[in-house]
Amino acid sequence: MLINIQVGDVLEVAANVLISTANPWLNLSGGVNGAILSAVGPTIQEELHTYLHCQGISAVPVGTVVQSEAGNLPFECILHAVAIDPFYDSSVELVRETIVAGLDLAINAGAKTISTPTLATGYGPMSIADFGTAVAPLANEPKFDEISLTIVVRSEEHRSELFEAISAARVSHRR
């Protein structure tokens, strides 16, 4: 998998699929989710709440990825990835498992290009470097060879931090 790091607004980086942050209640309440709600209106929020209602649940388990429409955003669909628990805790392993679930779902949807913010780093406890550590080993997974992942960060400082973490994790993973 080719991993690109870009500074900007994740909602403006066109890709086949956006893997977005999500909380267990699938509420579009802040950060990237709040930006989705502002850009698209209540349609996606209603779709996510309908999903919960149809499942007979009020929240999804940690690691769940739920697909929705993308509205007027430059994606074929949005994959809402829950990489935090109800207390907003997370780990490198949980982020990696959640990203893998999202990438698998994206591939099944026929995606070749995927964009994502750094999951569990806003309201969640993870650092940008932790996210890099979680994602780096996936670059060498054969099942992801045909896709590219663009990780979108908000600053040049975060881009540098993420690049260093991914580079360091790749070196230690090869040992």
Where are these regions (language model features)?
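Glycine-/small-residue-enriched capping loops at alpha/beta junctions
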Residues: 1-108
